[in-house]
Amino acid sequence: MDNVDKTMKSEISEEDPEQLFRVLEVIGQGSFGVVCTCINTVNNEVVAIKFLEMEGEENSSLKKEITILKNTVRCPYIVKYHGCYIKENNLMIVMEYCDGGSILDIMQMCSITLTEAQIAAILYQIVEGLVYLHSNKILHRDIKAGNVLVNKLGQAKLADFGVSAILVNTGFKQKTVVGSPYWMSPEVISPPKGSNGYDSKADIWSLGITAIEMAESKPPLFNLNPVKVIFVIPFRQAPTLEVPGNWSPEFNDFISVCLNKEADKRPSAVDLLNHPFIKKGKEHSQPTISEMVEQCIPTMKEYRRKKAEEEEAEEAEEGDDYDDVNGGGDERQHGSSVSSAGLQKGTLLKINTITQRATVMREDGTEDTSNNGGTFIYNNNNNNSSKTSSSGTVVFSKNGSIIKNDDDDDDDIEEGGFDSGSVVFKGSTLVEKFESMKLKYNKRRQQQESSDEEDEEDEDDEDDEEGGFDSGSVVYTKSPVNQDD
């Protein structure tokens, strides 16, 4: 625990996780690490474990995430926290496993459009979760379909508190620009004159965007590069459903009240419980979600099986030699896993504040849905102590927050265990399996980056917005919106 500060050590169990858990299958992976389903060998309970590398002393966000999870264990609308362990410099956060995966998984793996009844049922439970969070002075700050997990019991649960905030008091407001670009509220990006920040109403805006995302399988403006989106959101009219007539007046009104550009005129989560659309969703919420999950699981299982077979076939062709995967002569930015050369203007990096490594999130002119937009952090405070970026730097950051990989996400459990589509690990211990998956992920990531660089054309398009980005930059050092005007 050498890299863990004293305050965080108190949160970590002294038990050996190798003796408690056995890895079953990978359900998510990214530059942050790996999320696996594991079985508790004591009580045979299946849990989800987030594996994170502990490097340096950047533990504040993890400490906050764990604190929030601990403080919300009694809420049925928030993913339950089971404990925290460290093994060989790897942090393991143990949480309940939701067998239906995320709402994003269901939409993408099953290629379905949710019905209005399903959307209402899900939104009701999300609102209940927000009521609990906001009453306890917690802002989620990253509400979206990818962060809502569901299970066969018909429960919808908020997850991923890596960028959440705990307010000091009821009147306290936040100033850090954080969240996923397409779901961010106008006041988070560009606080109105005279405003000292934003509060829980920012989550209500994200909820409205999530409602549209569930109805249309993508959030508004998803055709735009995320850099451009942060310039557009504060100055455009509030989004609506593309074809309002296809939906009920109650649903249209729900979106309208959530997406009021004046934050103080948006309803609170408590207010939304009395909205006709949410009251309609409450009536049959759990049966509706349960039926949806049961219907989708076979399709999702087949999707994952095929993906696992494809990956195994690719590995068989390439061989297991990983000696040269991180080689090459390109200069790397401090700790970066991507080259600073060859990236187009407008390229975004996601920065892992735990490992201080960067990977390409989305390049200019592309539309990559696999990362679901990423998570954006911009610190307006002058006392920023982050070691990965100086105050005033705009980055797309992991900060402990999971960016879902659509192709590798939440797998279902069959009676007696997992199906034959499970990922095959090298090594036998938890840590060895974690290291094995990191190698696989980094190998695929580097192959994708190499392919992207080969196909890259020297194009210059619309991302050079007012406010000015340095041509060829990969990390931007200006506020997303000029707030001094």
Swiss-Prot record:
Enzyme Commission number(s) from the entry: 2.7.11.1
Biased composition (Polar residues): 474-485
GO cellular component: cytoplasm; nucleus
Keywords noted in UniProt: ATP-binding, Kinase, Magnesium, Metal-binding, Nucleotide-binding, Serine/threonine-protein kinase, Transferase
Domain Protein kinase: 21-278
One example GO MF annotation: protein serine/threonine kinase activity
Enzyme class, broadest EC rank: transferase
BP-aspect Gene Ontology terms: intracellular signal transduction; negative regulation of canonical Wnt signaling pathway; positive regulation of apoptotic process; programmed cell death; protein phosphorylation; regulation of MAPK cascade; signal transduction
UniProt-listed SMART domains: S_TKc
Database matches in InterPro entries: Kinase-like_dom_sf, Prot_kinase_dom, Protein_kinase_ATP_BS, Ser/Thr_kinase_AS, STE20/SPS1-PAK
Tree of life domain: Eukaryota
UniProt region (Disordered), positions on chain: 304-343, 360-424, 436-485
Bias type Acidic residues, positions: 310-324, 406-417, 450-468
Transmembrane segments: none
Biased composition (Low complexity): 370-393
Pfam families in alphabetical order: Pkinase
Cofactor(s) essential for the protein: Mg(2+)
PROSITE patterns assigned: PROTEIN_KINASE_ATP (PS00107), PROTEIN_KINASE_DOM (PS50011), PROTEIN_KINASE_ST (PS00108)
Family to which this protein belongs: Belongs to the protein kinase superfamily. STE Ser/Thr protein kinase family. STE20 subfamily.
Protein name: Serine/threonine-protein kinase dst4
Source organism per UniProt: Dictyostelium discoideum
Gene behind the chain: dst4
